[in-house]
């Protein structure tokens, strides 16, 4: 059935409000460039912020433009069950709070691929970098596509500006949006993202709740709203395994398992938010507040428009056509229930959602490019040594150029997703496809000490190859475990593919790791053969050939071999990957797990500090500062103040402006130096003033970090 696309709604006042908002956010984000003294500031906001700013920032990232569009669409079609995706993240949160979060902070990694190099090997970093960049670029593409679909209903076919007639197209609209978003993240960095998100997060919550509350009033109040909804719309869960486009079991595997772990553990954009908190404790508070309070509210914010639209369609069927495009439902219902200007504000909220999510992801891609591509390549080309100090000026330039480049790649990725009928299905396919191998790699790497480089690389290469076979043969490989979900020949098992992908990736990871002793034995025997390099090179050629065969078979369906033959080849190829990795990769299980798994976090804290921990409880102190000569990164306190703080020279200190509403914007980290005798005074160097941008005469608060 052809769906009706809404066009040319809204007024000139709405456009004025939208444009003013976009310009304001551009200027606001660019303003924060002054807080970027180095790449630590650009990517991680200087590790300075308190929990409430990060919690609100996470809201703006989680409630992206595709959330408004896709959950309102599902709310319109299926009711309150559209909130399932926002209520199923809780059971993985403890693993994040007490496992992954302290690991990534205390290990001082600057990207997820860097963690894999330290935990496994440089080759592991290479493969994870490829998957991570694909994940982030794809996510950016979905964001841009959604933004275009959301704003397109407002657009006429032509727009006249100063006498010139401009033809409006979806891709043209997306390119303009990309320029705006790319500009402020390119120059503002992570601090720009966090503070624009503080504004946008509040705006998103207010706009979404306003649409829901005003919509309920529009249909006659809560009693009328409740009675207008069909009984099935009031259920908290969708059908167990039907319809194919939205069901509980599919949502569980695609979103609750793959999506939740992917969002918490591997979404570098989100992780960089937590790395911008002043310490791990603040990050834990931000995550806890988000899961207990922000996500339930967010479920109403993004789904409420669809619920109201359903009630309006029952009350007055003429206002909302039966065959309306579900992706337009939030924009349409907002236009119906709000007046000129207010509707523009609501659309600006969607713009805020896109800008928040995409800017976060672009910042993350730039971080990965600088840390995991640019620097390793320069080391490989012998232009620099691995331990050389970073050229911050060059790194900042590379970060900004790469941000602009990934903005363009994100727009190009739109073409890959535009063929899907709805954003919800496109996003589900994206989650089910790119999340499982990285999810298994991260989860096993952090929580299973015995997980080896062979297990990881076999998961990434062999697991992905088996996933490709699942896409090519869904009836044979996915349907037996699809829990009875209907088969859609155009988009087969969009959700249940996540379960299949998780099974094959987990199976490869576990089996290869458990066979590590046997793999080492075989590798040692091969090393004794005179022409062992020829054997290994032949295996590498075989691995590449089989992987190419799997790709050709899925995309071109050339039927090189029947399913049984392809599965056999792929399994044998996976064994070869494990053997080649075991043969070439040097791995010290003790050294490369200490401080990098959940079982040795205390050691990671010592590494973070650089000395033994001082965990004595102390008090925070209020101080003023005095500038002294020197360029050493230490701050000197009085003996009395250090006694209050239970601090010793060499301990870590965090000092901030006492104005809580700044959320740590004017703050910095340093080290306790030798004490002096001026109580209530700290001795700063100019570098501390530059980092913290403290205001002369303002009272500061200092706390011992560890």
Where are the regions a protein language model picked out?
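Short, charged beta-turn/beta-strand-edge "cap" motif at the junction between a beta-strand
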Residues: 658-662, 705-706
């Amino acid at each position: 059935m052809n769906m009706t696309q809404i066009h040319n709604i809204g007024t000139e006042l709405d456009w004025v409000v939208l444009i003013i908002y976009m310009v304001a956010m551009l200027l606001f984000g660019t303003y924060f460039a002054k807080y970027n003294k180095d790449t630590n500031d650009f990517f991680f906001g200087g590790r300075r912020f308190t929990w409430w700013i990060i919690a609100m920032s996470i809201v703006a990232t989680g409630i992206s433009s595709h959330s408004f569009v896709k959950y309102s669409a599902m709310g319109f079609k299926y009711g309150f069950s559209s909130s399932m995706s926002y209520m199923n993240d809780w059971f993985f949160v403890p693993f994040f709070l007490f496992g992954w979060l302290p690991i990534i902070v205390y290990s001082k990694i600057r990207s997820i691929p860097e963690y894999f190099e330290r935990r496994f090997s440089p080759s592991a970093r290479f493969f994870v970098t490829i998957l991570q960049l694909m994940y982030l670029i794809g996510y950016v593409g979905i964001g841009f596509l959604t933004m275009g679909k959301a704003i397109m209903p407002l657009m006429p076919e032509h727009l006249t500006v100063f006498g010139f007639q401009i033809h409006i197209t979806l891709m043209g609209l997306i390119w303009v949006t990309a320029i705006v978003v790319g500009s402020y993240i390119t120059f503002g960095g992570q601090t720009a993202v966090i503070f624009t998100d503080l504004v946008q997060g509040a705006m998103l919550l207010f706009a979404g709740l306003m649409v829901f509350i005003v919509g309920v009033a529009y249909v006659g109040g809560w009693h009328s709203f409740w009675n207008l909804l069909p009984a099935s719309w009031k259920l908290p869960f969708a059908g167990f395994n039907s319809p194919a486009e939205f069901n509980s079991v599919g949502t569980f595997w695609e979103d609750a398992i793959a999506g939740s772990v992917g969002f918490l553990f591997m979404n570098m954009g989100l992780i960089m938010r937590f790395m911008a908190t002043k310490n791990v404790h603040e990050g834990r508070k931000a995550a806890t507040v988000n899961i207990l309070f922000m996500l339930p509210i967010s479920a109403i914010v993004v789904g409420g428009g669809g619920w109201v639209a359903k009630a309006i369609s029952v009350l007055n069927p003429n206002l909302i056509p039966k065959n309306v495009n579900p992706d337009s439902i939030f924009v349409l219902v907002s236009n119906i229930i709000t007046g000129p200007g207010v509707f523009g504000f609501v659309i600006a909220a969607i713009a805020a959602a896109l800008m928040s999510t995409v800017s976060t992801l672009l910042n993350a891609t730039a971080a990965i490019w600088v840390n995991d591509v640019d620097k390793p390549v320069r080391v490989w080309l012998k232009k620099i040594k691995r331990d050389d100090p970073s050229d911050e000026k060059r790194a900042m330039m590379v970060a900004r150029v790469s941000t602009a480049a990934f903005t363009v790649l994100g727009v190009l990725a739109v073409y890959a997703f535009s063929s899907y009928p709805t954003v919800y299905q496109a996003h589900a396919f994206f989650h089910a496809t790119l999340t499982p191998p990285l999810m298994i790699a991260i989860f096993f790497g952090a929580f299973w000490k015995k997980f080896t480089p062979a297990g990881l690389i076999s998961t990434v290469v062999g697991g992905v190859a088996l996933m490709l076979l699942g896409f090519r043969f869904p009836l044979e490989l996915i349907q037996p475990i699809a829990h009875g979900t209907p088969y859609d020949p155009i988009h087969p098992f969009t959700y249940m593919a996540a379960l299949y992908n998780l099974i094959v990736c987990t199976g490869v990871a576990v089996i290869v790791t458990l066979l590590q002793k046997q793999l080492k034995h075989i590798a040692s025997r091969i090393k004794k053969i005179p022409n062992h390099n020829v054997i290994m090179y032949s295996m590498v050629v075989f691995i590449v050939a089989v992987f190419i065969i799997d790709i050709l078979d899925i995309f071109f369906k050339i039927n090189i071999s029947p399913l049984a033959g392809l599965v056999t080849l792929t399994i044998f190829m996976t064994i070869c990957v494990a053997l080649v990795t075991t043969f070439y990769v040097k791995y010290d299980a003790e050294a490369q797990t200490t401080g990098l798994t959940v079982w040795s976090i205390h050691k990671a804290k010592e590494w973070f500090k650089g000395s033994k921990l001082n965990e004595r409880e102390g008090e925070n102190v209020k101080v003023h500062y005095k500038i002294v000569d020197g360029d050493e990164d230490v701050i000197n306190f009085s003996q009395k103040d250090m006694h209050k703080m239970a601090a010793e020279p060499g301990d870590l200190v965090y000092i901030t402006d006492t104005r809580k509403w700044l959320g740590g914007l004017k703050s910095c980290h340093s080290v306790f130096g030798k004490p002096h005798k001026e109580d209530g005074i700290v001795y700063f160097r100019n570098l501390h003033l530059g980092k913290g941008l403290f205001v002369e005469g303002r009272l500061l608060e200092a706390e011992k970090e560890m």
